[in-house]
Amino acid sequence: MKKARKIILSVIVSVLVLAFGAAAVLTYLIIPSVTFDFSSQSELTGRASGFLYGFAEDDIPSREIAESIGINSLATKTAGGLQHPIGDVRDVSDTFLSAGGEMLMVYTQDMYDTWYYQLDSLPEYNEKVRKTVTEMESSSYRDSLVYCIYNEMDNGAWLGNFWEAENRYKFYDAWKETYFLVKSINPDAKLAGPGHCGYNYDFIKEFLSYCKENDCLPQVVVWHELSDQSIYRMEHNFDGYYSMCDELGIERIPVCISEYGLMSTNGIPGESVKWISRLEKQDAYGCVAYWRLANNLSDTVADDVTPNSNYWVYNFYGKMKGKELASTERDILHSNIGKYLKGVDPLMNKGFIALASYDKDEEKFYVLAGGSEKDSKIKIENLGDAFTDGDKLSVKISYVDYKGLGGAVNSPTVAEIKYITVLGGSISFTLPCQRESQAFFVEIEKGEADSYKNEIKTVRYEAEYQSLDGIGATVEGGAYALSGGLCVKSISSETAPFVFKVNEKSGGIYRLDLVYGNVNSEGSERIAAYLKITTGTNECIVKCPSSIKPDCMECVSLEVKIQEDKEIKVEVLTEGCLITLDFIDLTPVSEEKVYVDRLTSRNTKEENAYFAVIPSDGYYKLSGITDDSLVTINGNEIEGNGDGIFWFGRGYNKIVLPEGVSFSGAERADYKVSSIDVYTPSETAVTGAAQISEDENTSSGEKFGWISSDKESGLSLLYKAPHSGYYAFTIEYANSEQGGYHDYNVDLVERYISIFVDGEKQGNFFFRSTYSWDYYKTKTVMLYLAAGEHSIEFTNDGSYSFNNKVTYAPDIGSITIIPVN
């Protein structure tokens, strides 16, 4: 058989060479491509937009940014669970569901505080299940629940080596008992299983056979895809699953891959395209694995309101409408051609992969693609009667590239707008791929468009390709996402400056994106690092927040002048910090506009919705708004004043306009009002054990700290509202609390502030970790105030607590109160 395959392949190659020539065959074999069949269409589900522990607390990340990616599923901690100090279903369900989420899966074994779960006994575990399920079944989110009652039992930690049949049947018996326990509480409850850490045909088939015989079939089948072979093998795995269902005579139960993706590649846009495409092709639910933090949609946002590069892949996916098109991939150099020729596996690819859909109502194609380091081809064939040869179609090609897990990417880049012609019932075009880390989004519709080609090029310089002579640093791989898979570690204030040799053809002003890691020396507290960036005679000092782990990449951006020597030196100034360098990107500086777009996520219900990614807190003018119509900003109805100027907090903002009103852009407004008030710690009244101290890292030079639930401490102030309406409370804060230890997850604690206006509680507002106490960010909360003077209190009332622990507010540098309009 192996010999036959080789003979067949050699015959095919020989025929191709004779028919088309060696150059054409070489092109066919080397150029990656995906061909879509317009005549073969199926439902587009959006189910791959799911996350394991994607939310830490209420609105962390924000419901608006989650809605924009069409979030579909969430796997998280059961009510009252102790596995992590965050992610309790009681606290995150409202954010998830209000963002449009569908499947809310809870891991009931996350009642335990250890990993892997420290078993007391199965009867005691079932009692924990009884307690948590009973509570959740009386909740407002019960109709969305799916109970994953056992997670990764095939690791053998509870019941012994799974390769021994006796131990597997111990698990099946335990499953049956817990299954009927949950069903006794709610006969209509949905349960998920077996929950294995990987796909094993024999194990899953045996489990389903047992469940059929014992009337305890799950309502959702769960396994994990966490292998570097998963992209290759996922279609094969699903084919095996479908065949076992047919053989057993049971329906094809919906599948949720409740943990997908690799620690080393999650967060890279081009890799995310692959997982999304594989899952969408199977109509499967999927949740991105939780390898690091629980407060960033599994490395899909930079913080609670800021997109990173990976965010845009899920934003693109959330925009896709209509029917999915069947596809055929070809990327021989990233395939398993060796195993195929040996007869081990069918021919499979994990390089250039794409997903496409067609919206009949809009007569529009959407293509999501990535994973190639060279120009790659997209073809859509068998267009039939929908298009006629000679029809002109406009093609808009946008892309994003990896900028670190924590690097802000406020917009995708438009690479090209062009038109193509239908020929022979098909269309084709080339994507200008440069790196496998890139992801492309293509929108194709009838009609010609003004041509555009982006001439502003970004050039990347990998740290591992630079000279390390005399520096004392090392080139290493990393556990987490890296550009090119390598980085330079252990650069410190005691090593020589690190030098990037750049070869820009001309000098000038460039935006420099420095992608780095920053950790403290062993045993010391996390701190931000100051780096000196030198280009010729120009120096710039930049503050780099902690990245918590050495190979978890953050990004800082600055403008630099490239001079004749074409060197960029990076020197660490802060003692006690170890810096990792991944790469720098250099882009010629151009005018940067606030990114604004229509909000067309599949989860968005409003007809006239937009979003804007705001670079910094302030007043912005929305073009086209000329009356006092109500404008809804992040769920708050704001009365306009005719000038279209509103206060926005930094990051992602959802804007809903009245019917018939639209705007095409936003720009910073030089707008001053007499009622803006900035309160520093020394200008407020202190209560309880709260303390004011100096802090050079805040805008005021001081901070307000130690606001705790057990000391009735806080700060209060008086504010006179000039008119009734919404006011922005922009709070400058730092938070670096951590609760517990985990082998790879970082158990950050999101502190909260309880705000009271005239004695009436407005809510608990959570503040995402800033990773160190010396790095401050801002969060904007919008509250309605009647005209007149108000007493406003900022405290932590202890109404929410993990495991009955004392709770704290973040450190506060200043509070700004200002009318939104």
Show which residues each predicted segment covers:
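Structured loop/turn residues at beta-strand edges in well-structured enzyme cores
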Residues: 45-46, 69, 142, 216, ...
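Flexible loop residues that form catalytic
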Residues: 56, 79, 152, 226, ...
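Active-site cleft segment of glycoside hydrolase catalytic domains centered on the general acid/base Glu
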Residues: 58, 114-244, 264-275, 300
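Extracytoplasmic
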Residues: 449-821
